[in-house]
């Protein structure tokens, strides 16, 4: 099942304290056929250096240094240069389980879904990360029905955030993240959902969202 190239895009801005841990969680993925795109969005700390050092150690890593343009712009740049059949967007202060890509890709292939979504857990520094042992089958739902459930508050952790998902690359042919817009995830993800006939929902926490005072959105 490990034949298609998958692009993992990390938008990066001043996250030197967390970046190594995030990159390590990506390069250790059980699914190995990855293109890892690190988009340094004009960082003023050691993040650019960390990106370059990891690129020397892993040939799958591509680094882009650009002027600061915000989270949406960094994501768009990464998507534009990506070559994978599927795309995952990982915030550079978060972590992903070792099987994150493999399990979501398997959901897409088995159900012919254009997007696969997993549950997520929040954590703070020092917290123990626990990966769910849930081995249940993914729920298959239409994009339109999922949007309806989200707006009705019935979707749980399968919402409009960008980062706990695997997307078919084709979806971004006509959709971009809006420059300078607040809640850019919501503005974009609902469009991606509506353009997807089928979405796979995996009720298993494979993405770990770090809670910290400052964030990549600042």
Over which residues does each language-model region extend?
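Nucleotide-sugar donor-binding/catalytic module of glycosyltransferases
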Residues: 1-218
């Amino acid at each position: 099942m490990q034949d298609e190239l998958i692009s993992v895009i990390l938008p990066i801005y001043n996250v030197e304290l967390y970046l190594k841990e995030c990159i390590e969680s990506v390069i250790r993925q059980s699914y190995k056929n990855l293109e890892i795109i690190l988009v340094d969005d004009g960082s003023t700390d050691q993040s650019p250096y960390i990106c370059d050092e990891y690129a020397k150690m892993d040939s799958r890593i591509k680094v882009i240094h650009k002027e600061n343009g915000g989270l949406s712009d960094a994501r768009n740049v990464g998507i534009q240069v990506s070559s994978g059949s599927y795309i995952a967007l990982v915030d550079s202060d978060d972590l992903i389980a070792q099987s994150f890509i493999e399990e979501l890709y398997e959901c897409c292939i088995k159900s012919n879904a254009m997007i696969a979504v997993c549950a997520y857990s929040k954590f703070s520094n020092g917290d123990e990360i626990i990966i769910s042992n849930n081995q249940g089958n993914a729920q298959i739902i239409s994009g339109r029905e999922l949007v309806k459930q989200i707006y009705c508050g019935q979707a749980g952790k399968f919402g409009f955030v960008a980062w706990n998902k695997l997307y078919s690359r084709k979806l971004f042919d006509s959709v971009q993240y809006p420059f300078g817009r607040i809640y850019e995830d919501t503005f974009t993800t609902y469009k991606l959902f509506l353009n997807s006939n089928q979405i796979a929902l995996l009720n298993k926490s494979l993405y770990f969202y770090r809670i910290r005072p400052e964030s990549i959105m600042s």
